[in-house]
């Protein structure tokens, strides 16, 4: 079992991204994973997942979702 990390932000806090592609953007914390030390910020760090067509789904699609970022890459705003 991993030790839970102490995280300096809470759900609902406004944070500013300090590193990475979304640097200097501001968003609200929507989810926290204390085991991995990662957070999900609403409207930040979008990733795409390409889904192939299969027997049930005749057409493929591209789904967009918010990926988690490490809590050390944000600061309170």
Curated annotation (Swiss-Prot):
Top-level division of the source organism's lineage: Eukaryota
GO cellular component: chloroplast; ribonucleoprotein complex; ribosome
GO MF annotations, alphabetized: rRNA binding; structural constituent of ribosome
Pfam families: KOW, ribosomal_L24
Subcellular location(s) of the protein: Plastid, Chloroplast
Alphabetized InterPro entries for the sequence: KOW (IPR005824), Rib_uL2_dom2 (IPR014722), Ribosomal_uL24 (IPR003256), Ribosomal_uL24_CS (IPR005825), Ribosomal_uL24_KOW (IPR041988), Translation_prot_SH3-like_sf (IPR008991)
Alphabetical list of SMART domains matching this protein: KOW
First-listed, main subcellular location of the protein, grouped into a coarse class: plastid
GO biological process: translation
Keyword set includes Plastid: yes
Keyword tags: Chloroplast, Plastid, Ribonucleoprotein, Ribosomal protein, RNA-binding, rRNA-binding
Main function: One of two assembly initiator proteins, it binds directly to the 5'-end of the 23S rRNA, where it nucleates assembly of the 50S subunit.
Family: Belongs to the universal ribosomal protein uL24 family.
Subunit organization: Part of the 50S ribosomal subunit.
Protein name: Large ribosomal subunit protein uL24c
Lineage, opening ranks: Eukaryota, Sar, Stramenopiles, Ochrophyta, Bacillariophyta
């Amino acid at each position: 079992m991993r030790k839970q990390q102490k995280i300096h932000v809470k759900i609902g806090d406004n944070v500013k991204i300090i590193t990475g592609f979304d640097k200097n953007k501001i968003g609200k914390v929507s989810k926290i994973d204390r085991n991995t030390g990662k957070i999900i910020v609403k409207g930040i760090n979008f990733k795409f997942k390409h889904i192939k067509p299969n027997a049930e789904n005749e057409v493929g699609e591209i789904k967009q979702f918010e990926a988690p970022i490490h809590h050390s890459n944000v600061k309170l705003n």
